[in-house]
Amino acid sequence: MKLKFTKMQGLGNDFAVLDGVRQTIRLTPEQIRKLGDRRFGIGFDQLLLVEPPQDAGNDFSYRIFNCDGGEVEQCGNGARCFARFVFDHGLTDRREIRVETARGVIVPRLADDGLVTVDMGPPRFRPADIPFVAAEDAVIHELEVAGQILGVTVVSMGNPHAVQVVDDVDTAPVTAFGPLIENHLRFPARVNAGFMQIESRTAICLRVFERGSGETLACGTGACAAVVAGIRRGLLDADTPVTVQTRGGELRIRWAGDGHPVWMTGPAVTVFEGEITL
């Protein structure tokens, strides 16, 4: 089977985007792992699948698969690339679209300067919504990792995040603690682990160890979760754009507080088009 794909990236978080509207696509986890291999396949952090919507009031359905073959609920950098893809490939002429995900509808909007802004929906904090094993919601939960007690803020942006504040992201134990947090027993569906350094009330540095992918150059939902966590902790300003510096570049995140959606703005870039035989 020959498969047409588009390689895209958002701040170095890279994707293979597949058009499931114009071609029928049914991939097994094993096939996705092969496609994700950077030596023998396409190579990507996530595979994004564009499909027709289930609800006629929406424009598309958006499915996300990590390079380990597992399907996940949400991907912020991928959402921007998704919006750029469907517009550039003539699947829509709208600059604002409604996109179904496994955890609700998101609304990406393309700007004339090439940036994409996405309404990522409101964050969730109840332990059952993460999911996270805890008696009740708290701004900071204690989590035992490698004999140490970490203070983490848990946030669902449609996918689960555990965010901790560190003094220096460059020396933070991302590769050592990341997989331990990801697979911690208190996160039944695993979790994305964020390491956030506060620069000012409107700027942070961030590294994220992503569930099923490892550390990536940037994580859009991780940036949203980090800003939300910082605001909940009283470290960042609400309803003000916060600059998130990742290893792949900058995102702008804005959240007005409880009950409001998180707005994410950043780039989405096409790298190349291709065709691969499975």
Curated annotation (Swiss-Prot):
Catalysed reactions, as listed in the record: (2S,6S)-2,6-diaminopimelate = meso-2,6-diaminopimelate
Oligomeric form and interacting partners: Homodimer.
PROSITE patterns listed in its UniProt record: DAP_EPIMERASE
Function: Catalyzes the stereoinversion of LL-2,6-diaminopimelate (L,L-DAP) to meso-diaminopimelate (meso-DAP), a precursor of L-lysine and an essential component of the bacterial peptidoglycan.
Gene3D superfamilies named among the record's database cross-references: Diaminopimelate Epimerase, Chain A, domain 1
Pathway entry: Amino-acid biosynthesis; L-lysine biosynthesis via DAP pathway; DL-2,6-diaminopimelate from LL-2,6-diaminopimelate: step 1/1
Protein name as catalogued: Diaminopimelate epimerase
Native species: Laribacter hongkongensis (strain HLHK9)
